[in-house]
Amino acid sequence: LFMVEEQIRDNLSSRLKNLGSHLIRVKLININTKKTLQIMAERIKDKKMDIEDCVFLSKHISTFLEVYDPISSSYVLEVSSGGLARPLTMIDDYEQFKYNKAKIVLKDKFLGKKTFKGFLKGVDKNGKILLETESDKIKFNFFEIEKANIDPNWAAKNN
């Protein structure tokens, strides 16, 4: 699945950019025998996405996928915004959403745990992601992160 997601991401990213949108995430989900291809995107100019944007992108993405055909079996296409709990999928996201509260889940335990919540402080000059928790200032390498999201239960401090 991961390979297919990467191929779709690589092929869709520049196409969406040409349409004024930024690709957030591509995820192929198997539930029983049904496949769903989830595409998350946002407008480049204001980082938002409304229903008209989703319909517009869905038509373009569907046309592209019919020609490109990366998934051999049938599937359902879902196009949406990143939502309030927007995933942080690229290293640039950690700088863009600086000062927002985030939840970061690591691939391996660090300081005895895998999940950390705190305020994003951006990316340092060495490419380490900075997170300020209630008790500490922590640095992570991007490749150590399994998944991360904006925490919608906290408003941005200064954005």
Regions found by a protein language model. Name each.
Residues 1-159:
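Short Lys/Arg-rich amphipathic alpha-helical segments
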